[in-house]
Structure formats: C-alpha cells, structure tokens
C-alpha cells in the first residue's frame, strides 16, 4: 500500500511473496483504520457545524471538513488500487493452499473497506438531511412567505441559495433575516459538497463491487499466456528429448563402427601374420 500510487490499472504485476503479501495486507488495514478515524472526525465536524452560528467558526469548520474529506478520498483511492492489485495477482496463482489464504485475506480487507464506504455514505446522507432541515428553518426566518418551490430552488439549483439571497436582500427584511440568509448560503454550499461526496462514495462502492468482472479480460489473457508458455515449454522439451535420443543413437553408431573397424584390422593383421610368417621361415 505504501506503493499504491504506483499501481497501474489493468497492468499485470508479478505476484508478491507470502511475506510481502501479508505486509501489504497490514498496510491496507492501517489505511482503512485511518479512513475510519477520518470519518469519525468528519461526523464530529458535521455536528459541530450544525451547532455553530458564528460565521468565522463555520468557515473554520468547513475548512477542516474539506481537509479530512480530501485526505479520506486519497486513502480510499490507494486502498482501492491496492486491493485491485492483490486480486489481480491472486488470479495468476495456481490453486493451492497459499493462494486460498491470499484470497481469504484479500476478501476480508475488501469487505471491511466496502463496509467502511457504506458507513461513510450513510453518515453523509444523514447529515445532508440535517443540513436541509437547518436550511429550511433559516429560509423560513428569512422569508416566512417562501413556498416549497422556493425552498427546492434554494436547495437544488447550483446558485439557488445565492439567487434567493439576492432577492431577499433587495427587500426590506430585518437584520435577523439577513443573518439567517447568510447561513442559508453557507448551508447550500455544505449540501452541495456532501452531495459530491455521496456521488463519489456510491461510485467507489460500485467500482469495488464490479472489480472482479472488470479484471476477467486481463485474467483471461494471463491464463492464455500461461497456457502458451506451458505449451511452448512442452514442445521444447519434446524437441530436446528427440535431440538427446538422436545424439545417443549417433554415439552408439560411432562405437559400433569403431568396433567393426577394430575387428577388421585384427582380421587383416591375423591374415598377414599367417601368410608372412611361413614365407619368412622358408627363406631361412
């Protein structure tokens, strides 16, 4: 996980050793714990923001929220890439006990990560509803005659709060109404930020759920390559076996020829001896 930012999606990776694998699992667990801590702080800051009435304090709380949300997004991306990498590696390995252990451990951290995404998603949805309630109350203070359509415009349109605010500021409403209106604008920004986070979390959860299907083409290629390698190795072994047999046969033939030559030489020597010895004896 400490190298998670170096992972490239869809690129084959050499499987880690068992020691490296468990080290990676520990890194992922640490990152998930950090995400849990961040989400706890985000929840606390949401509650604090709802209770604040001072503009400066609200702005400071918003900055903290944005910081923790950004850091959590970064950690989630790293964890997603790390789990994706481990799943890809697991699919390249033979079906033995070590591979079963890897798959079990990978699935465990993946489940924990997805549970954490669900938890964060629920928190954001809960506080989005509370921000809307707070915004509605402030709108009612700012403009008691505001309709449901006015409220929906202020909530849903990107610049709805600002448009509503400008219309009211041109009126003769009291200072209390104008103060409430400033909070409406701030809550509108909070709601939009939460909506973006909710959309990102929902997409992340979906990506994690469909990760295996996305990897299938890559895995098929890995398996095909592995089969081709084994086939080529098998063919190479067969060729080598034939070459060895041919070499052995050639050596055997050479020894046979050598033996025949030796026998022929011996016969020739014997014949010569049988002829020459009597002749030499008669001369004497």
UniProtKB/Swiss-Prot annotation:
Membrane topology qualifier: Single-pass type IV membrane protein
Transmembrane domains' residue ranges: 260-280
Coiled coil region boundaries: 23-57
t-SNARE coiled-coil homology domain location: 181-243
SUPFAM superfamilies: t-snare proteins
An MF annotation (GO) of this entry: SNAP receptor activity
SMART domains per UniProt: SynN, t_SNARE
Cellular localisation: Cell membrane; Prospore membrane
The keyword Cell inner membrane is annotated on this UniProt entry: no
Main location: membrane
Pfam families according to UniProt: SNARE (PF05739), Syntaxin (PF00804)
Keywords assigned: Cell membrane, Coiled coil, Membrane, Transmembrane, Transmembrane helix
Source organism, top-level taxon: Eukaryota
Family (UniProt): Belongs to the syntaxin family.
Protein name according to UniProt: Syntaxin-like protein psy1
Source species: Schizosaccharomyces pombe (strain 972 / ATCC 24843) (Fission yeast)
């Amino acid at each position: 996980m400490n190298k998670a930012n170096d992972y490239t999606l869809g690129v084959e990776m050499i499987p880690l050793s068992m020691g490296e694998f468990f080290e990676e699992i520990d890194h992922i667990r640490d990152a998930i714990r950090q995400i849990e801590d961040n989400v706890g702080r985000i929840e606390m800051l949401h509650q604090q923001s709802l209770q604040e009435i001072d503009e400066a304090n609200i702005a400071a709380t918003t900055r903290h929220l944005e910081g923790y949300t950004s850091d959590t997004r970064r950690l989630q991306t790293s964890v997603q890439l790390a789990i994706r990498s481990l799943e890809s590696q697991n699919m390249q390995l033979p079906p033995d006990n070590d591979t079963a252990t890897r798959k079990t451990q990978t699935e465990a951290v993946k489940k924990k990560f997805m549970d954490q995404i669900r938890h964060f998603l629920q928190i954001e949805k809960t506080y989005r509803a509370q921000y809307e309630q707070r915004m509605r109350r402030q709108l009612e203070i700012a403009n008691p005659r505001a309709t449901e359509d006015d409220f929906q415009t202020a909530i849903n349109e990107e610049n709805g709060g600002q448009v509503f605010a400008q219309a009211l500021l041109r009126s003769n409403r009291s200072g209390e109404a104008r103060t409430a209106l400033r909070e409406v604008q701030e809550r509108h920004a909070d709601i939009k930020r939460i909506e973006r986070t909710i959309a990102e979390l929902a997409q992340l959860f979906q990506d994690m759920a469909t990760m295996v299907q996305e990897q299938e083409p890559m895995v098929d290629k890995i398996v095909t390559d592995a089969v081709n390698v084994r086939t080529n190795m098998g063919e190479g072994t067969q060729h080598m076996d034939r070459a060895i047999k041919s070499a052995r046969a050639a050596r055997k033939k050479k020894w046979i020829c050598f033996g025949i030559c030796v026998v022929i030489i011996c016969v020739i020597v014997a014949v010569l001896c049988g002829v020459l010895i009597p002749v030499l004896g008669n001369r004497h």
